[in-house]
Amino acid sequence: EQVCCGMPALLSGDEQSADKLGRINQEIFKTETVITVCPTCNRMLAEEYELKGVRVMDAFEFLNEVSNFQLLTSNIQTRTAYHQPCHSAGTKAPEIIKAFLKASTDYQEIDDVCCGGGGLFTFKYPELSDMIGQRRMETLLLPETSNMKPVTFYVVTNCPGCMMQLEYLLSSGKQGIRVRHILNLITDAHKTGCPVPHTQE
C-alpha cells in the first residue's frame, strides 16, 4: 500500500524518513500516470521522487485532459471564488480550474494570497499563521456582498490542507461562505442531479 508522500517529514528536516517513504511509494508507482488531489503531494512526487517516465497530474487536470470537461457538470448555479494553493504555483491546475469555474458558475476573481496553512507551519507558528490567514479573509469580503445580506458562495480550492485552514478561519465569522474541494463541488452536483444551490442566509 502507498504511504504518505514524505513532504511533512522532509520539511521538518527528517530526510531519512522522507527517503524511506519515497522508496516505498516508488515501488508502487510503476505506471504511466500518478494522479493527486493535493498540490503538496503533487510537488513532492514530481520534484523529489525519481519517477522516470511517470506523469504526476492534479486530478482535475487529468479530468480535463481525458474529457475536456464533457463529463463534468456545467451550469453549477452558485457563486464561487478560487483559492490557489501555494504549491500549485507553476502548474497547469489553477488556470484549468479557473476556466471551468468561470464557464460553469458565477465566478468572482480574488487575489492569490496564502491562507497561512502550510502544513506543519500552522502548528509551529500559530500566531503568524493566523496573521497570514487574516489577509486571505480580507480578500473574501467581496464588494457585492459588503452592504447586503451575504449571498452563499463557495471558496473552491484543490488542496485539502488549504481547505482545513480556510474552514478554521471562517469558523468565527463570514457566514454564507463555504469551502469546497473542486472535486467535491462537482460530485455534489452530480449526486443531487441538479446545480449546487445558490441561496441566501
Regions found by a protein language model. Give the residues of each.
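Iron-sulfur cluster-binding electron-transfer modules in prokaryotic oxidoreductases
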Residues: 1-201
